[in-house]
């Protein structure tokens, strides 16, 4: 099949507005998501230039990065955070942008809120001034993060200049065993190819293990595509996708729905399409994962040990490992299950959806958070919070000693009041474990929600496949 195309190539080709010779192509943007941190300068630029939004109905805004998870009052915010959320509110009013502010029942993390409202649709191009925009690729959308100057350009023109990426297929064959989640799959992938293994590529995740995931699970996988260096991550839409989207606020309705599904079914990689790179994993080989260092690629199975830099032949990699161990405060050869923690964070755009909270609640139910451990659960949106409370998950967490919070980005990044102190060691369901990511001098271990909840009650990391 000479004209066979990949999923990415089909979406890309359908969005090219112009391809000037010797220049980067111009592509159309279907959905633009904005938040309070990366948008102020963009709106200011429009005001200075006297420009209006090209398509205000295709721009959606929320407040998430700097918001408080303890109170919905503006008085709970720092002066800078308050300025940012008030500025976003004024900009949205001035330019006619739909805003989900801190008092809106659907407010939440932009990458949680967008999909659950049906803003995210297969075959679309979605951008946001946030690196984890790749999350939306779980629906077969081409979604990627952009800088503030590009935010302004999209607001003004609804287009972007972009160079076409290379294509990579990551196939996870077979099925995972009990206790292994989408978070473990993507951490295992990053551990295999490294933090730069996907640089220059748009990755398509496929295989039986990916197809078996819920939409929440697929979003977790695509969310961390950026952590392997990829421009974006995508999963071909299928019946799981359609069932998730049906009836959501911004999804097509009635006869438009049938027409949309017919189109979406064609958005998949053709037989015979050639990828620039292919990576394969056997799902049965994946165990619950746990990072030991200061990037997501420094990861091992829960039944493993902290690796020894002396066993690394590459001098640069060895030096990186030594630096990571010095910062993280661990010794080579330490059993992962012997690592104690004093903080737990269940939340973020990676793992704060209803499925994630249900998974964590299984390990919290009937137990108590260990002495000396502080654990917080932050639902990803108002909808997730309401659903969790309707199911009684909040009571399970509270009775176990977890703190139940309001939606927001929270402890994923040290940009709001939820942050770690120097020396804290945290089991976190977020996506980055860089030095100082959760607070100056903090030490972060990335895990699944189930692993995080289990660590909270045990006081140390445990293999959730075994009694503890």
UniProtKB/Swiss-Prot annotation:
Bound cofactor: record note: Binds 1 [4Fe-4S] cluster per subunit.
UniProt keyword annotation of 4Fe-4S present: yes
Enzyme class: lyase
Cofactors required: [4Fe-4S] cluster
Swiss-Prot/TrEMBL catalytic activity: (2R,3S)-3-isopropylmalate = (2S)-2-isopropylmalate
Keywords: 4Fe-4S, Amino-acid biosynthesis, Branched-chain amino acid biosynthesis, Iron, Iron-sulfur, Leucine biosynthesis, Lyase, Metal-binding
This enzyme's EC code(s): 4.2.1.33
GO terms, biological process: L-leucine biosynthetic process
InterPro entries named among the record's database cross-references: 3-IsopropMal_deHydase_lsu, Acnase/IPM_dHydase_lsu_aba_1/3, Acoase/IPM_deHydtase_lsu_aba, Aconitase_4Fe-4S_BS, Aconitase_4Fe-4S_dom, IPM_dehydratase_rel_enz, IPMI_cat
Protein name: 3-isopropylmalate dehydratase large subunit
Organism: Shewanella baltica (strain OS155 / ATCC BAA-1091)
Lineage: Bacteria, Pseudomonadati, Pseudomonadota, Gammaproteobacteria, Alteromonadales
